[in-house]
């Protein structure tokens, strides 16, 4: 359980010493489907006063990640699909951008966009003090995503990874909730900004192209006909 709800436990224990005692005595159920229910019940038994909304938001996000993890047979299917997408991605990225921009892309349905009032997403450099410091800051909009992958992390016991996103990456990805040509997305995205000169336009255009290529490389957006229907 401590693996799945690291941030919630860390924050709750920091705010209330009684919670740490409860967690240390917690016995995980054999049925993992009941784990989240029991964990929430234990969390609700402790008062966090003005921090309740923060605790609930962190728990909600970690619960989402927990519920996204796949069974081993599903992970193997994703792995097989990733091999195909990797092969096709190399072909796509070798195209001239003028040709690439006319292809319809859509969000990979294995990614799940999220936002929070605190910087919750973890990276490989995280530690307890960083997490607690981030959660002590005033609320501010932060963006990230969860991605179901074909790799099972035996230490974290999940195949779900998380990535921090900039505001622009988040809103750019949102444009692909339905199939769209890159050229249309670029135009719509640039129209949001009040571009004053050709220099500003070219700089913005170049940055959007760069973000889109990274999204394609990371399989966050994929050609419409490659959309994974079901796992």
Q: Where on the chain are the PLM-derived regions?
A:
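Aromatic/basic-lined ligand-recognition segments
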Residues: 97-105, 111-113
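Low-complexity, glycine/alanine/valine/leucine- and proline-rich hydrophobic stretches
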Residues: 109-176
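Homeobox/homeodomain signature
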Residues: 101-103, 135, 155, 211
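Long, charge-rich, low-complexity alpha-helical segments
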Residues: 1-96, 161-231
């Amino acid at each position: 359980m401590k693996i799945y709800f690291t941030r919630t436990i860390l924050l709750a224990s920091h705010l209330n010493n009684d919670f740490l005692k409860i967690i240390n005595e917690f016995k995980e159920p054999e049925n993992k489907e009941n784990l989240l229910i029991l964990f929430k019940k234990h969390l609700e038994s402790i008062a966090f006063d003005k921090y309740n909304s923060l605790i609930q938001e962190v728990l909600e996000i970690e619960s989402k990640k927990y519920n996204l993890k796949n069974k081993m047979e599903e992970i193997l299917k994703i792995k097989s699909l990733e091999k195909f997408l990797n092969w096709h991605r190399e072909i796509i990225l070798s195209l001239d951008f003028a040709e690439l921009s006319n292809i319809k892309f859509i969000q990979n349905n294995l990614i799940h966009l999220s936002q929070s009032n605190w910087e919750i997403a973890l990276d490989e450099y995280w530690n307890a003090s960083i997490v607690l410091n981030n959660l002590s800051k005033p609320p501010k909009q932060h963006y990230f995503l969860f991605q179901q992958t074909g790799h099972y992390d035996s230490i974290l016991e999940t195949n779900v990874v998380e990535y921090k996103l900039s505001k622009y990456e988040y809103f750019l990805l949102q444009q692909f909730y339905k199939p769209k040509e890159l050229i249309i997305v670029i135009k719509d995205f640039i129209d949001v900004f009040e571009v004053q000169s050709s220099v500003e336009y070219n700089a913005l255009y170049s940055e959007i192209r760069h973000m889109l290529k990274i999204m394609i490389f990371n399989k966050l957006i994929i050609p419409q006909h490659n959309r994974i229907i079901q796992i």
